[in-house]
């Protein structure tokens, strides 16, 4: 637990409790075969269709990676002969879908709809023109804004974890940065 961020821990715990244990809880690890894994993969695909849509391939990959890491741990430390997840093969896709961004034309059509909503208008202006993430925007404080240099200091992020508002460090050191605000935003 201490080696990962709290949000990561919560995500892993959720996957184990809702996606892995319901299927595998009555099985002994050493008796689980690649065939069992393939049946679980099929049940994951079916479950996502029953819920009105399909899980994203990257989410399925994340769920399977969690299962595989549990088996890897057993192979490494408890003499399990092999990892049946590796033998069974991939469940989800390994590349995420390309991110979609508004063109300037699309944004310019949208932003007038926020004209009477001052806070929303400013939020969208910062998000679009500065290219910051929503969690970074929500974590900004007045001390992070320098109007003399027209910069934002991005040093933290907002997350909602288990119903609580939490300010966290960014995931990576590269996420800590200074962002220049265009004049249109700084005014």
Q: Where are each of the predicted segments found?
A:
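N-terminal core-binding DNA-recognition domain of tyrosine site-specific recombinases/integrases
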Residues: 1-84, 96, 118
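Short, charged, low-hydrophobicity "junction" segments
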Residues: 10-19, 123-136, 162-168
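Conserved tyrosine-mediated DNA breakage-rejoining catalytic core shared by Y-recombinases
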Residues: 89-90, 106-108, 139-187
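Hydrophobic/aromatic residues in well-formed alpha-helices
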Residues: 9, 37, 107-110, 145
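Basic, Lys/Arg- and aromatic-enriched nucleic-acid-binding interface segment
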Residues: 53-57, 61, 76, 80-140, ...
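Short glycine/proline-rich turn/loop motifs
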Residues: 22, 48, 91-93, 168-171
């Amino acid at each position: 637990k201490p080696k990962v961020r709290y949000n990561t821990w919560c995500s892993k715990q959720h996957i184990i409790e809702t996606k892995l244990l319901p299927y595998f809880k009555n099985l002994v690890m050493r008796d689980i075969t690649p065939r069992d894994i393939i049946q679980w993969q099929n049940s994951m695909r079916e479950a996502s269709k029953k819920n009105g849509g399909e899980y994203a391939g990257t989410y399925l990959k994340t769920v399977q990676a969690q299962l595989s890491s549990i088996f890897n741990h057993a192979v490494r430390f408890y003499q399990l002969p092999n990892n049946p997840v590796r033998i069974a093969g991939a469940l989800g896709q390994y590349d995420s879908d390309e991110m979609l961004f508004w063109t300037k034309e699309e944004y310019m059509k949208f932003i007038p709809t926020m004209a009477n909503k001052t806070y929303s208008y400013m939020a969208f202006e910062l998000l679009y023109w500065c290219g910051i993430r929503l969690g970074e925007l929500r974590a900004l404080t007045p001390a992070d804004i320098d109007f003399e240099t027209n910069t934002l200091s991005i040093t933290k992020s907002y997350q909602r974890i288990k119903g609580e508002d939490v300010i966290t460090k960014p995931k990576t050191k590269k996420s800590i940065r200074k962002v220049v605000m265009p004049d249109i935003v700084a005014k």
